[in-house]
Amino acid sequence: MLLALAGLSSAAMAQQKTEVVEYEIIQVQDKYQVITNPFWSNWFFSIGGGAEATFGDNDSAGSFGKRISPTLNISVGKWFTPGLGLRLQYSGLQARGFTYDKGADYVKGAELKDGYYKQRFDYMNLHGDVMFNLNALFGGYNQHRVYEIIPYVGAGFTHNYSKPHREALSVNAGIINKFRISNAVDINLELSAMAAEDKFDGEVGGDHGYDGVLSATVGLTYRFPARGFRRPMPQLISQDRKSTRLNSSHCST
């Protein structure tokens, strides 16, 4: 009888099985997808300096080089997404040009050869801009990217500090070339253009019906904490289940 019980026990052991389940999880992360940041995240401050050239009604009377003057810009803004931001910028300093009218506003000095006069006046241009980070829009978010190109468009107004004081509406556009130095600091090369109402330089007329300024500046941007964007959890897109059945070896009696 003992032999019979041993045989039954061996048969039961042979029928036992162990199931091992293996899961294969494939996770992907959308390089364009980030979590919307709080209001006080991703603010920045920028300052820069460089040179500008004025294009007024009669500025072609003098050489281009003599219309170049110093300029500066100070900006504060926020990135709402890696590809879209807003900023407020104060720019300007001094504009230089020429006129044939001795009685025109902002004339400085005596008559020059060919019958024209120098113009010079101090001004500011306060404008709001919408910025588009093309690298983030087309290549996805990458906080360690060294170079990014950021075009912008905006509108504002000018104010001439020199007398007679004058205000004019302005539209603005440009390109920011951003070079990352650290998590907090960038170097910027900004190329900008402004078109203002024709009265900006104190004269009305000419071929275009507006006055313009082109400028190039080099500056620094500081990004306040909290900076950067967080990504959502990776998504589970597939799951494979594999089962392996292990039978115990049959015991001989």
Set out the residue ranges of the language-model regions:
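Short glycine/proline- and aromatic-enriched beta-strand/turn motifs that initiate or cap beta-hairpins
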Residues: 14-75
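Short loop/turn motifs that connect adjacent beta-strands in outer-membrane beta-barrel proteins
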Residues: 32-42, 83, 136-148, 181-184, ...
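Residues that define the transmembrane beta-barrel architecture of outer-membrane proteins
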Residues: 41, 66-70, 122-126, 147, ...
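Residues on the lipid-exposed face of transmembrane beta-strands in outer-membrane beta-barrel proteins
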Residues: 47-51, 74-78, 128-134, 153-157, ...
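Transmembrane beta-strands of outer-membrane beta-barrel pores
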Residues: 49-55, 90-96, 134-136, 155-161, ...
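Outer-membrane beta-barrel translocator domains and adjoining extracellular loop/strand segments
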Residues: 57-63, 98-105, 142-144, 162-171, ...
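Gram-negative (and chloroplast) outer-membrane scaffold detector with strong preference
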Residues: 83-168
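Single conserved hydrophobic/aromatic residue that forms the stacking wall/gate
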Residues: 246-253
